[in-house]
């Protein structure tokens, strides 16, 4: 029982006393679970002031620009760790020992192959389908091939499903790309890292060996780390909502992918690149900056600012450094990249952007990196989904471990009152 209480006074001087819960970090939370029995609900469209669950996985302080995974700062993880170690931390809550990490990595590596019949499913899609449409369908279909681990009440089944999803996502993501460009699928290699294996499956062909560039490999690994989890966002909440009904893990992750596909969520880096294409040249930047400052103009700079972070996005700091490393390594000369770098310079120095805290965010830099690597913008959200899969799994598993209720939001009904029905049709 919480020590602190909150009181709500309703019409007629009826007072409801509610517990105030305290977390390890962050805001206090008023426990409103008893409100329904009192005949009232809360109204919070978008759940911006509602804690839908209790979680020990990720903490965000948007005002201070803090992002912690199991208590570890994101910048330390991105700099001193690798994606699979971060996956272990998210899934199990603690840093792995060397022995635990080696076993974890081996298990993931040995499950990267997908059932051969799944490769045939790709051919049911049009070649010009958006890769996210294909990714949604293929992920949901996994339940038809791996139905020996679908008992969500069995911890071992949940762990097996977690390994399968984490292992097979890069394979399926790369196959989405290969299918879209008409090239043969490239199978995974056990001698490569998680990020290196993905790059090899993306760019290798039967004609020549693809040598994984270590700078690009590290950049991809960092992209995966920085997108691994972000607390109760739209797609994670979707996974939890789907999971609350007892749905199988593959269906839940497919639901998360569908939510992530939205341009307001996972499509932000793709939208940022399209904005750069619209600007097209450095000489056009002043005009677009002027429009961005005009509140009556519909144009908005994509990839700047963040709904949660009122300060600098902590992920963007690492991503900016990585972006410049990649551009230096590749020596790329590209009009859009020049536009991006000039926009970055303006945003970091223009008083308007500084005052509004419209700093370049992780989507801005990740889009530039992926483009420089030769990855088309249609694949950006697929890579985001691949990275976020471990976060979705961690939340899905936590929900089952801690106990859950089926999600059933309420509504503020503003439709017709009860009325009689008399058909106007001739009978």
Swiss-Prot record:
One CC-aspect GO term: cytoplasm
Active site: 306, 363
Pfam families: Citrate_synt
EC number from the UniProt entry: 2.3.3.16
Domain of life of the native organism: Bacteria
BP-aspect Gene Ontology terms: tricarboxylic acid cycle
Functional pathway: Carbohydrate metabolism; tricarboxylic acid cycle; isocitrate from oxaloacetate: step 1/2
Regulation of its function: Allosterically inhibited by NADH.
Catalytic activity: oxaloacetate + acetyl-CoA + H2O = citrate + CoA + H(+)
Keywords assigned: Allosteric enzyme, Transferase, Tricarboxylic acid cycle
Keyword Transcription: no
MF (Gene Ontology): citrate (Si)-synthase activity
Additional remark text: Citrate synthase is found in nearly all cells capable of oxidative metabolism.
Quaternary organization: Homohexamer.
Protein name, as recorded: Citrate synthase
Name of encoding gene: gltA
């Amino acid at each position: 029982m919480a020590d602190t209480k909150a009181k709500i006074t309703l019409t007629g001087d009826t007072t409801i006393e509610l517990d105030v819960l305290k977390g390890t970090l962050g805001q206090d939370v008023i426990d409103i679970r008893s409100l329904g029995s009192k005949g009232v609900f809360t109204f919070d469209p978008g759940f911006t002031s509602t804690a839908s669950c209790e979680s020990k996985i990720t903490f965000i302080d948007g005002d201070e620009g803090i992002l912690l995974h199991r208590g570890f700062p994101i910048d330390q993880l991105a700099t001193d760790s690798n994606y699979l170690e971060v996956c272990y931390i998210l899934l199990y809550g603690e840093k792995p020992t060397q022995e635990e990490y080696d076993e974890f990595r081996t298990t993931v590596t040995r499950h990267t192959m997908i059932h051969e019949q799944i490769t045939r499913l790709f051919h049911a899609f049009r070649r010009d389908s958006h890769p996210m449409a294909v990714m949604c369908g293929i992920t949901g279909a996994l339940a038809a091939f791996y139905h020996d681990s679908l008992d969500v009440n069995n911890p071992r089944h949940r762990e097996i499903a977690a390994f399968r999803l984490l292992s097979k996502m890069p394979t399926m993501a790369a196959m989405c790309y290969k299918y879209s460009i008409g090239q043969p699928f490239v199978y995974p290699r056990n001698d490569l890292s998680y990020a290196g294996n993905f790059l090899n499956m993306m760019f290798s062909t039967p004609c020549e060996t693809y040598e994984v560039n270590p700078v690009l490999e590290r950049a991809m690994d960092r992209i995966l780390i920085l997108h691994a989890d972000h607390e109760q966002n739209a797609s994670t909440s979707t996974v939890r909502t789907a999971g609350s009904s007892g749905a199988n893990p593959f269906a839940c992750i497919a639901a998360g992918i569908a939510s992530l596909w939205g341009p307001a969520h996972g499509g932000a880096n793709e939208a940022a690149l399209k904005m750069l294409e619209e600007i097209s040249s450095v000489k056009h930047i002043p005009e677009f900056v002027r429009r961005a400052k005009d509140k009556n103009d519909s144009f908005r700079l994509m990839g700047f600012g963040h709904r949660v972070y009122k300060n600098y996005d902590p992920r963007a700091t690492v991503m900016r450094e990585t972006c410049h490393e990649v551009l230096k390594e590749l020596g790329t000369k590209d009009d859009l990249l020049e536009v991006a770098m000039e926009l970055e310079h303006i945003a970091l120095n223009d008083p308007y952007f500084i005052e509004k805290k419209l700093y370049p965010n992780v989507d801005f830099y990740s889009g530039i990196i992926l483009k420089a690597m030769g990855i088309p913008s249609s694949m950006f959200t697929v890579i985001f989904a691949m990275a976020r899969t471990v976060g979705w799994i961690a939340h899905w598993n936590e929900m089952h471990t801690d106990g859950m209720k089926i999600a059933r939001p309420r509504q503020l009904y503003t439709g017709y009152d009860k009325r009689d029905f008399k058909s106007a049709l001739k009978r």
